[in-house]
Amino acid sequence: MKRTFQPSNLVRKRRHGFRARMITATGRAILKKRRAKGRHKLSA
């Protein structure tokens, strides 16, 4: 059985990156929350 985590920087950026977050309203809400919390890193 193969492991479930098969790292790929491209997939990581496409799924969890800043531009991916900005596309949807929910994603923008996530960024807003992270800014409010004071996170230094907003997205992957």
Curated annotation (Swiss-Prot):
Please give one Gene Ontology molecular function term for this protein: structural constituent of ribosome
Which keywords does the record carry? Ribonucleoprotein, Ribosomal protein
Q: Any keyword Cytoplasm? A: no
What InterPro entries does its record include?
Ribosomal_bL34, Ribosomal_bL34_CS
Q: Give a yes or no for keyword Ribonucleoprotein in this entry.
A: yes
GO CC annotations? ribonucleoprotein complex; ribosome
The record, for Pfam families, names:
Ribosomal_L34
What name is this protein filed under?
Answer: Large ribosomal subunit protein bL34
- Whichever gene encodes this chain, its name is rpmH
